[in-house]
A protein has these predicted regions:
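Extracellular/surface recognition and adhesion modules
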Residues: 17, 27, 37, 61, ...
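Terminal beta-strand-rich extracellular "head" domains
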Residues: 99-155
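Surface-exposed ligand/attachment interfaces on beta-rich extracellular proteins
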Residues: 56-60, 67-90, 99-123, 170-182
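Short, surface-exposed beta-strand-loop junctions and turns on beta-sheet-rich folds
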Residues: 24, 33-34, 100-104, 167-169
């Protein structure tokens, strides 16, 4: 028969067996706490989650985070209002969404806006690049182009916007293409190294 004991941790002793109130429960292996169930019910793991028979660390889920990031222009002469974007990070996969809304704009600097995490450095056959459809108003799209798209390159901590068109090379959007009436909504999903 397999023996077991229900134990919990209190402020004076390491482990106790029996009834408990307002104390965390911990599961130990090799004398190390591996799983903690707090008195409010949330669970803390000391390592990561492995699905099925997965043993490779790269294939384990070890991170989940939700938060906000204050967007900032990489280049000068662009000031943003409503500059908070929301993000969710699950493992190395990040999804961000927000609005780009200038409050002051001048010059011909390229429009580049910070991200909460740097994209993965990826080249060769995998060539990780990420794009976003953009809902926009009051953006000056060059007459020879059709639309604009959001873009995150490899190993970059910012996103940018490109003009796209039929049988034309990409052309990066600049501050001159925006105004204080501009609004651009975006959502990106990209990989990071963290």
């Amino acid at each position: 028969a397999v023996g077991y004991a229900l134990q919990y941790k209190d402020s004076t002793t390491r482990m106790r067996q029996g009834t408990y109130t307002n104390h965390a429960m911990e599961l130990f292996t090799n004398d190390n706490a591996r799983i903690t169930i707090a008195n409010d019910g949330h669970v803390v793991l000391s390592n990561s989650i492995a699905f099925r028979n997965e043993t490779t660390a790269d294939n384990r889920l070890d991170d989940y985070e939700e938060g906000v990031h204050t967007q900032a222009p990489v280049n000068a002469n662009l000031t943003l209002t409503n500059n908070i974007l929301r993000y969710t990070k699950i493992g190395r996969l990040v999804t961000v969404s927000g609005i780009l809304k200038p409050s002051a704009v001048s010059s011909s600097n390229a429009v580049q806006i910070t991200l909460p995490f740097t994209s993965v450095a990826d080249s060769g056959n995998t060539c990780g690049r990420y794009t976003s459809a953009l809902m926009h108003k009051f953006v000056n799209i060059d007459d020879s182009y059709r639309n604009v798209v959001g873009y995150i390159g490899q190993n970059e901590a910012y996103w940018r916007i490109y003009h796209v068109g039929d049988n034309l090379d990409w052309h990066q959007l600049t501050n001159n293409d925006l105004s204080t009436n501009t609004e651009i909504f975006f959502t990106f999903t990209y990989h990071t190294t963290d």
